[in-house]
Amino acid sequence: MNGEYDYEDGAQHQDGARESAVAGASNTNQISTSFFPPPPQVYKKFTKRNLRYLEILNSHKLADDEPSWDLLSVTQRLERQNAILRQPGSSSKIDAEQLQDEEADMAAIQDQDCDKPMTDLPDFDLKAELEPPNVDWIEEDGGYTVFGQLWPIPDVTPTLQQLGIPVLYPLEGTDRKELLLTLLRTLLQTYREITGDLLKPAQPYDVWVPAVPDPNLTPEQQQQQMATNPGFWTQTTEAKDRLKHMQNVVVNMQFLINELRPVQAKETLKLIMQMQLERRKQEMQLIQERCATMRARVEELKKMLGKQSDCYGSS
């Protein structure tokens, strides 16, 4: 019993040490493995103190001989920002006690700033980090960048050719339903063939992979890119080729399904309208039936009253 207990205790200690090591490694690398990752850390900069500083910068009027903020470099912007915030006067003076009261509710998101004295100024560009983006500039540039990914305006769905994926179906004049069934049969057939390839010894061979031009470049730049880097040789096997073919088939199926989204939305809207019409018809039929029942009841009451009046008259 004691030996078994010691073994379990030792296993628990080992598991705890392993979990601590993993936690320490994750904290060191700052990698989030959560299914719902936390928001970007830029939200910590939106404190009440920084927003007050931003109001001071926006209320400051530049002299005629001073260049605009957009013409300054990053270092020059920080120097001007610190110079404006250090100016004495009521417009640039922030009461420390008032700031402490205002930031008491935001202590959870300002753990790193709480240890700093209130006289410390931000070490980042307030106008660049806290001001909302300029919509005119976004429309002029034709898109915006979020977390390193470019989103064009209006939103444009890239074609399979632009993604470097071969098109496995004719582009025009074909029923998409039949195309999806054909691609599904191709996927199943390729899956059966790849199971047979796994039972045979691998025989690698070299294939030429052509380069795909960058769709964001101009045609002249694309030609220059293809001239300098037309492609490369790589080693592959039949199993790898079939696996790549299966991936291309799945992407083609997804692309066709996405093209059917407007049709699906249209048919769904038709179905909803038909359901609403049928419900209105059922409600109208129910009302008519109730009205007919009430009329019949009223007629019965009239007949009963007529018979009673005849009986009283004859008596």
Curated annotation (Swiss-Prot):
The organism's place on the tree of life at top rank: Eukaryota
Gene Ontology cellular-component annotations: core mediator complex; mediator complex
Cell compartment(s), UniProt: Nucleus
Organism placement in taxonomy: Eukaryota, Fungi, Dikarya, Basidiomycota, Ustilaginomycotina
GO MF term set: transcription coregulator activity
Composition-biased stretches (Polar residues): 25-35
Name of a matching Pfam family: Med7
Alphabetized UniProt keyword annotations: Activator, Nucleus, Transcription, Transcription regulation
Record gene name: MED7
Cross-referenced SUPFAM superfamilies: Mediator hinge subcomplex-like (SSF140718)
Protein name: Mediator of RNA polymerase II transcription subunit 7
Organism: Mycosarcoma maydis (Corn smut fungus)
Primary residence: nucleus
